[in-house]
């Protein structure tokens, strides 16, 4: 199996804001450069880990979009983006989102009762975004088959499982130590 994701994480820049150390990576930030081979590696690994007998893939804007696009093209499964702005479409479901660094609303459109879905996102840290997505999908009557985040940083997996009952799959678990990304698993 390719390890492009892990190798690229080991060398990504770290930026300190206050007391928090942010890792800056193409998958989580879209900078400095998203290379096709990295996106291909990630999307191929995702496809092997998720239930593909589904109707739709769901992500929240913004950095889940390149990943779901690549997975959608490879699998012919359409995707839905939970947006940060309201569209006022019939059936739109608003849900409050709180992460470690922001609060706001997300809006779900394009999901019908009984739709089989996979949730896919770039990073899980606090779990706030995934809890919001899961809550919106439950309100819509969707059948959530899998939840997967590319990068796990923090305790978000436990938070999501405690609050929703869903286990979150990840490709890689990291932490930032002494200004560098450490791969944990």
Swiss-Prot record:
Primary gene name: hpt
Protein name (Swiss-Prot/TrEMBL): Hypoxanthine/guanine phosphoribosyltransferase
Source organism per UniProt: Methanococcus maripaludis (strain C7 / ATCC BAA-1331)
Pfam families linked to this entry: Pribosyltran
Locations listed in the record: Cytoplasm
Major localization listed first in the record, in broad terms: cytoplasm
Record-stated family: Belongs to the purine/pyrimidine phosphoribosyltransferase family. Archaeal HPRT subfamily.
Source domain of life: Archaea
Keywords: Cytoplasm, Glycosyltransferase, Purine salvage, Transferase
Phylogenetic classification of the source organism: Archaea, Methanobacteriati, Methanobacteriota, Methanomada group, Methanococci
GO CC term (a single one): cytoplasm
């Amino acid at each position: 199996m390719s390890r492009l994701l892990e190798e690229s994480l080991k060398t990504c820049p770290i930026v300190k804001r206050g007391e928090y150390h942010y890792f800056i990576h193409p998958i989580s930030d879209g900078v400095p450069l998203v290379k096709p081979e990295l996106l291909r590696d990630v999307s191929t690994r995702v496809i092997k880990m998720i239930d593909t007998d589904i109707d739709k893939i769901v992500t929240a804007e913004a950095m889940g979009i390149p990943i779901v696009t690549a997975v959608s093209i490879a699998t012919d499964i359409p995707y839905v983006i939970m947006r940060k702005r309201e569209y006022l479409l019939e059936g739109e479901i608003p849900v409050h989102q709180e992460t470690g660094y922001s609060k706001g609303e997300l809006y779900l459109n394009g999901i019908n009762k009984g739709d089989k879905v996979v949730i896919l996102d770039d990073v899980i840290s606090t779990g706030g975004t995934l809890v919001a997505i899961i809550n919106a999908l439950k309100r819509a009557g969707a059948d959530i088959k899998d939840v997967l985040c590319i990068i796990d940083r923090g305790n978000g997996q436990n938070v999501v499982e405690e609050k929703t009952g869903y286990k979150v799959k990840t490709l890689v678990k990291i932490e930032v130590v002494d200004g560098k990304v450490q791969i944990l698993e």
